[in-house]
Amino acid sequence: MAPRFPKFSQGLAQDPTTRRIWFGIATAHDFESHDDITEERLYQKIFASHFGQLTVIFLWTSGNLFHVAWQGNFEAWVQDPLHVRPIAHAIWDPHFGQPAVEAYTRGGASGPVNIAYSGVYQWWYTIGLRTNQDLYTGAIFLLALSALFLIAGWLHLQPGWKPGLSWFKNAESRLNHHLSGLFGVSSLAWAGHLVHVAIPESRGEHVRWQNLLTALPHPRGLEPFFSGQWSIYAQNPDSTNHFFGTTQGAGTAILTFLGGFHPQTQSLWLTDIAHHHLAIAVVFIIAGHMYRTNFGIGHSIKEILEAHTPPGGRLGRGHKGLYDTINNSLHFQLGLALAALGVITSLVAQHMYSLPAYAYIAQDFTTQAALYTHHQYIAGFLMTGAFAHGAIFFIRDYNPEQNKDNVLARMLEHKEAIISHLSWASLFLGFHTLGLYVHNDAMLAFGTPEKQILIEPVFAQWIQATHGKALYGFDVLLSSANSPAFNAGQSLWLPGWLDAINNNSNSLFLTIGPGDFLVHHAIALGLHTTTLILVKGALDARGSKLMPDKKEFGYSFPCDGPGRGGTCDISAWDAFYLAVFWMLNTIGWVTFYWHWKHITLWQGNVAQFNESSTYLMGWLRDYLWLNSSQLINGYNPFGMNSLSVWAWMFLFGHLVWAIGFMFLISWRGYWQELIETLAWAHERTPLANLVRWKDKPVALSIVQARLVGLAHFSVGYIFTYAAFLIASTSGKFG
């Protein structure tokens, strides 16, 4: 008889109920809990899976390039980036009638196509690609790279090629490889590509393999580099009337510090970007060589941490014991990585629209909206995941003996103070923000809008002024013509910055008022509450006053009976589960704010946001309802249009979201009864009863039902907003 699923758990494989399938799927990636797992095999499996991950990523990016080259309109878009709509790929759908075929035939295509809102066209254009041939070449290169990584993953699972445990735990060598090898050298390579290919292309000079070694990126070649006259590389930058992609107005500089945006493309100067990557490369290549690897010189991370004791001894033993705790816990490392990557992803969202790096992307409004929203949602999931693995670390990997009186132990010791302070901050923000909104609603409802409480964000405006925004009249630092910072900025560094920050047509330091003040605090409420739930979940994961032995129950347990006063909803998993709802709601507010602020900016009616954002009805009526009108009437008895698919997705997203509640608001017993009734009916129905199943059907566990509910809630929520965002933006701006 063939071995039953799951092979990794004999106990589960022998379970006679459908629980075997669901628990098997749920624990498939929890390698630590599998039969016959050793620490070494655990590390080897994860290491090999990284190659698989890279394979999938390169295959996906290769597919993007291939489909645009095959079915897109890249060459036509390059001729007129502001008016040609970029095509992602063709659509073949047997359900399309003639009206649909006509509605989706756009961008100069011969049949129905999807428009690209990912920004890849702008990116490829900026980095020097110009023809479909370029795209095909890139696709084939990435496909080969993908195959290479797939082979590497397989290879590192073979007996002679499996790294040992000591190799995985060598922190200094890993830092050397990651900082210098991956970050440093790749940044240097990218700076090289920008200087040798992208910048010449932006000046009308076509550099490809055949002339790469003969075309000088700078007229003086390497002579200024070796003679130490590096400033020569910054002289003669592109002029403000440079026509991107041509020699008109082009300069010869390759590494500059201009600041601001290229007037025509509304994106950062390519020479500034190249300079940035070169600087990053230098910093990281040096950083990666500071640690002790083969030669007995440089820092030892363990020694640094052991020596790091706070002065005066009042803060305990500092970082003693942390090295082994972190180095022996994959969950701790993953938690740190997710937290860092989550923050970086959110920063990417903020910087992609305020400091656009790709030519013409700032004028592609739907793409700007899609990229901002996408990166904020990704950041939310990464950040919540960080706390989930932090909690698992405390349950599975934390050793109190190893960490006596160090920073970790002290966090646990004063967790009540941390949790109660977060709770206080959340309550304060919530009641005051809601109170202001509701007061303003009441005033508008009673016909006295002048009695609203409107608070100017003076501190934030002052910070904007210090960075050079003159509108508020603060006359401080960069907004003061008398300050040394202002004078240096005119010549020494970033001369283009002040023009950019005071130009109202971009998204740099947007003008803010009372509506921004309120929504800022609403978002702060969401962030603090999400953090409260996550921090409490992690700090209470080992035990709490109510349930001191919680760690014995593991990461996710539904209840521990009535004996302790009813300990349901108390596991670390439950905290994560609750936090994800808060995370999604908070990002909802963040994206609503960003999107509404920007559509009024792009349409030239910022007064609508300023006037309507100070009360809740304004948000509901003038943002959500007004912008969903095209979706609510997306297709009707009189026909359809190119927004119909988004209207359908808007409905479908609501449906998926609502299905989530079916799993969230119910009791397990109800489902078990229902399932047994259905099984009974099935067994007594002719023909149907010829089909039998081996496993006895049982209801999902409480935790599993919550997971399924949460998954539907999240997916439906994101689908709904994605359809709303893309349709309302593309419907207005084409």
From Swiss-Prot:
Keyword terms of this UniProt record: 4Fe-4S, Chlorophyll, Chloroplast, Chromophore, Electron transport, Iron, Iron-sulfur, Magnesium, Membrane, Metal-binding, Oxidoreductase, Photosynthesis, Photosystem I, Plastid, Thylakoid, Transmembrane, Transmembrane helix, Transport
Record-listed E.C. numbers: 1.97.1.12
Cofactor note: P700 is a chlorophyll a/chlorophyll a' dimer, A0 is one or more chlorophyll a, A1 is one or both phylloquinones and FX is a shared 4Fe-4S iron-sulfur center.
UniProt: chlorophyll a B1 binding residues: 654
Residues where [4Fe-4S] cluster binds: 559, 568
GO biological process, one term: photosynthesis
PANTHER family the record matches: OUTER MEMBRANE PROTEIN, OMPA-RELATED, PHOTOSYSTEM I P700 CHLOROPHYLL A APOPROTEIN A1-RELATED
Subunit structure: The PsaA/B heterodimer binds the P700 chlorophyll special pair and subsequent electron acceptors. PSI consists of a core antenna complex that captures photons, and an electron transfer chain that converts photonic excitation into a charge separation. The eukaryotic PSI reaction center is composed of at least 11 subunits.
Primary role: PsaA and PsaB bind P700, the primary electron donor of photosystem I (PSI), as well as the electron acceptors A0, A1 and FX. PSI is a plastocyanin-ferredoxin oxidoreductase, converting photonic excitation into a charge separation, which transfers an electron from the donor P700 chlorophyll pair to the spectroscopically characterized acceptors A0, A1, FX, FA and FB in turn. Oxidized P700 is reduced on the lumenal side of the thylakoid membrane by plastocyanin.
Protein name: Photosystem I P700 chlorophyll a apoprotein A2
